[in-house]
Amino acid sequence: MLIKIVIACVITAIIVALIAWKSAISYYKKVVEGKIGSADEKAREIIDEALKTAETKKREALLEAKEESLKTKNELERETKERRAELQRYEKRVLTKEETLDRKTEALEKKEAKLVAKEQELDRLRVEVEESHQKQVAELEKISGLTSEQAKEYLIKTVEDEVKHETAVLIKELESRAKEEAEKKAKDYVVTAIQKCAADHVAETTISVVQLPNDEMKGRIIGREGRNIRTLETLTGVDLIIDDTPEAVILSGFDPIRRETARIALEKLIVDGRIHPARIEEMVEKAQKEVETMIREEGEAATLEVGVHGIHPELVRLLGKMKFRTSYGQNALKHSIEVAILSGLLAGEIGVDVRIAKRAGLLHDIGKSVDHEMEGTHVQIGVDLCRKYKESPIVINAVEAHHGDVEFQSLIACIVQAADTISAARPGARRETLETYTNRLKQLEDITNGFKGVDKSFAIQAGREVRVMVVPDQVTDDDMVLLARDLSKKIESELEYPGMIKVNVIRESRVTDYAK
């Protein structure tokens, strides 16, 4: 029963819901239909308005198109007129140019015709001139007795002789003028420098003499079975010569430092009176220390005398060793001091750094202090030493260039070379061995005799002048100037010599006849 009631309620609810839904649908349909009708009406109004607007714009667009078309048409007509006018002007210019070109072409054709005529005339004249030239040459050859080639050679030789003469005269004039001016200035500088410098001359020797209180001392120096003299010779490297010379012992050796060490040691032994191997060894050791001290003191004294400071202590010691070195009889240390002083004086006259000039002059021969201990020339050794002890590039170049091995890089190097030459070349500064002297003179004569046209030559004035006799038929007066110049250059390049050598070329013609 309850179930039936529930079912009846459910069915009733469903029916009520269906009725309500249907009513809602009907109401909504009416509302929608009302809205649709309203929308259709508005749509028709909008369409009508749009049609009216479109018609208006269409008419406006047609009007604008017509106006633009008319404007474009007018512009095209204007441009067409302008182009036609420009084309007409261009045609006129072309016509004018064509007329001008025609006139020029006509004138050119006339000129070409004239030119052809002139060329023909020139060809005719050229043939006539050539024929005339051949006739003249033949006539000249007939008159002079020379062919054209011979005449050319004669003319060339004549011109060459004239040029040689003018060249020789010009060279002589320029050399004379340059020499006068250079010699005047150089003499002023050198004379001033030499007047302010005075240096000693030391004769080269390989022996030293030790005076003895009496001849009995000779026996004590020799010792039992000669052991004393052998010990002294072994320790010093010097030969002791004991002969009939009264109260004297001669020390002979080529190393002056060893000879000086032996002299001091022997004098100490003589004063002490105790002469035996142990005492000799002790005295030699003392003498070596004394000589080393003397070397350093001499080096310091040299730097003080010249006025050069800041030199490396080892270079100062090597300067001191140069006191015991000689070259051709000239003491190496005295020579270096003299070069330093002269370099400073010359630098002061010229106006360059006096301090560096003195320094370079003092060190220019530093390699001579050890050239007997090391391989190489004293120049290269000196350069290596200066580089090792941080000398300036100017000083190094002066050391390297003072014998002409390299080019000068500063005025200082030129000054040092000049001072070195002055010191070495002054009278009495150096002496040569007889063999070296004669070889140098022979070399000088051989060099001059090797030139064409030289008959004989004589080296005179101790090799400071060479007189060259030439064959007069082979060497003219003008050739003498060139020959003297060539001889000077040859001597400079092949011969080593102190100072200058005067080249005197002599051309002499002699005619001999006899009166009968």
UniProtKB/Swiss-Prot annotation:
One of its GO terms (cellular component) is plasma membrane. GO terms for biological process: mRNA catabolic process. Residues 206-269 form the KH domain. The keyword Hydrolase applies. It is a single-pass membrane protein. CDD domains: HDc, KH-I_RNaseY. The chain crosses the membrane at residues 1-21. InterPro entries: HD/PDEase_dom, HD_domain, HDIG_dom, KH_dom, KH_dom_type_1, KH_dom_type_1_sf, Ribonuclease_Y, RNase_Y_N. Its EC number is 3.1.-.-. It is found in: Cell membrane. Its main location: membrane. This is Ribonuclease Y. The gene is rny. It comes from Lachnoclostridium phytofermentans (strain ATCC 700394 / DSM 18823 / ISDg).
